[in-house]
Amino acid sequence: QRIQHIRDYCEEIRKTIERYGEGFAVFDQDADYQRSIAFSILQIGELSGGLSEEYRKATSSRVQWGPMKGMRNLVAHSYGSMNREIIWETAVNDIPTLKQFCEEQLAES
């Protein structure tokens, strides 16, 4: 169930990028865009923290769970000063890979 929710937030990020437009310049200038992406990343980090230690260890070669939780903390505790470049890079580079992983896991179950 958590993997399904993580996948859903990955899809939300994809849809948000599709809606607002690709490119950091667009993202950097739109606070709503930033908040939407950041919220989904925060939720993904929160959900990943609830996965069993056994599962995280078993899948650690495919997903870096620790940094994901770290991103959650970065977003949650940035108090308006989050690093937009890191958020953007996560959204466009890491989230598609995570989504693919989740889809594979869901197909196997």
Indicate where each model-derived feature is located.
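Solvent-exposed interaction patches of small proteins and small membrane subunits
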Residues: 1-109
